Structures are given as structure tokens and as C-alpha cells.
Design a protein with these regions (language model features):
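Short, highly charged C-terminal tails/helix-capping segments
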Residues: 178-187
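Secreted/surface-exposed cysteine- and glycine-rich disulfide frameworks
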Residues: 80-99
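Hydrophobic pocket/interface hotspot
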Residues: 48-53, 105, 142-144, 177
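Active-site-lining helix/loop region of Rossmann-like oxidoreductase modules
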Residues: 1-6
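Short, hydrophobic/aromatic-rich segments at coil-to-beta transitions
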Residues: 108-116
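Beta-strand/loop substructures that line and gate deep hydrophobic ligand-binding cavities in soluble
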Residues: 118-168, 177
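Hydrophobic ligand-binding cavity/cleft-lining segments
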Residues: 8-83, 186-187
Length: 187
């Protein structure tokens, strides 16, 4: 009964460790996730940051180091994955189940959290999560975290090979989103 409830997507709680959806609905994928991320503070309100976060993908791409995102997409396409699939249902609005390029929206709490499931071919299952926290005084913290549930030794090797790039990309990406939110609010 618990697995059926989890598969239906109607689970009321949120957790990352062992979450069936975050493991690509596979039992053979690691229960405990590896994770990497970055954060930045924007001198603007949560709504301005949320608008940039929900605009990710499609024509906007990923705001930072798009050449590396494109390289990963091409690598995925070469092994038969959806890596070069780009686009989204709507340029600024997201809802559960939407596809954003090769990601799927699996969690959304307006102005607080956006959770995307990784859709490329890889030895494991991944999730990219954006969390927004209002700090008061017109400041907002954006935190981006990638969770990776490896499948076997290849999944671990894949994760550890990409950790340096992930740290670089996620720190830069959160800073780029924060600066963009500030510019959009003031402009």
C-alpha cells in the first residue's frame, strides 16, 4: 500500500533519502543520495527569484555555462538519450509533470521550492532542486542542490567524475539567477 501511494505521487511529505520518485521509480538505485550544490543571496524578494527559477530551460537555457550543459546534452544524445530535446509547455509557468528540456517537474511549491527529475541516460537517478528562502530586508537566498542516487559502481564513478563540474556550475548558476532576478526587478 505504501509503495502504491508513493507511485501515485500523492505522498504528502517531502524527503530526499529513499524517495521512490527521486530514484527514478527503481528499486535497484541507491537509497541514500550523493549531493552537491551552491547558493547565492539576491537583493530582491522571493517572487523575483522564483520568476527566474521557473523560467529555467527552453530558450533561457540554464543562465550559466550553457556550453557545459550543451556538451552533456550532446553526450546523452550520442547514447540514445533525450539530451538534445529542448523546450517547455509554457515559457514562464510550470506545473507538476511538465517537461523542461530533459527534466520533469516532480515538485513545486510557489516561491519556495522547485524539484526537477533528471531525464538523461545515466547509471542512476538524479534530481535538481531549487529552494528559495526569504531573509527579510528585501534579501532572498537561493539554494540549488543536485541529488544523485547511483546505480552500482558505474553510478558512483559517474557521480565522482562530475563533482568538480557540479560545484563550479551550481555556484555560478545560483549567482547568475540571483543577479538576473535583481536586474529584472530593478529594470
Amino acid at each position: 500500500a505504501a509503495i502504491a501511494t508513493e507511485r501515485s505521487g500523492k505522498v504528502a511529505v517531502r524527503w530526499t533519502e529513499g524517495n521512490f520518485a527521486m530514484r527514478g521509480s527503481r528499486h535497484d538505485v541507491a537509497y541514500y543520495a550523493k549531493h552537491a550544490g551552491g547558493s547565492a543571496v539576491a537583493n530582491t524578494d522571493a517572487q523575483a527569484v522564483w520568476e527566474q527559477v521557473t523560467g529555467i530551460g527552453g530558450r533561457n537555457r540554464y543562465y550559466y555555462m550553457n556550453v557545459l550543459w550543451t556538451l552533456r546534452e550532446v553526450m546523452d544524445w550520442c547514447v540514445g538519450g533525450p539530451g538534445l530535446t529542448r523546450g517547455r509547455r509554457h515559457p514562464t509557468e510550470l506545473r507538476l509533470g511538465d517537461t523542461v528540456d530533459y527534466w520533469t517537474v516532480i515538485g513545486i511549491e510557489p516561491q519556495r521550492r522547485l524539484t526537477l527529475s533528471f531525464g538523461m541516460r545515466a547509471p542512476g537517478a538524479g534530481v535538481l532542486e531549487f529552494e528559495i528562502e526569504s531573509l527579510g530586508d528585501g534579501r532572498t537566498r537561493l539554494t540549488e542542490t543536485a541529488y544523485w542516487h547511483p546505480r552500482g559502481v558505474w553510478g558512483l564513478l559517474y557521480w565522482y567524475a562530475l563533482v568538480p563540474a557540479h560545484l563550479f556550475i551550481f555556484r555560478g548558476m545560483t549567482s547568475a539567477i540571483a543577479r538576473r532576478a535583481e536586474r529584472c526587478e530593478s529594470g
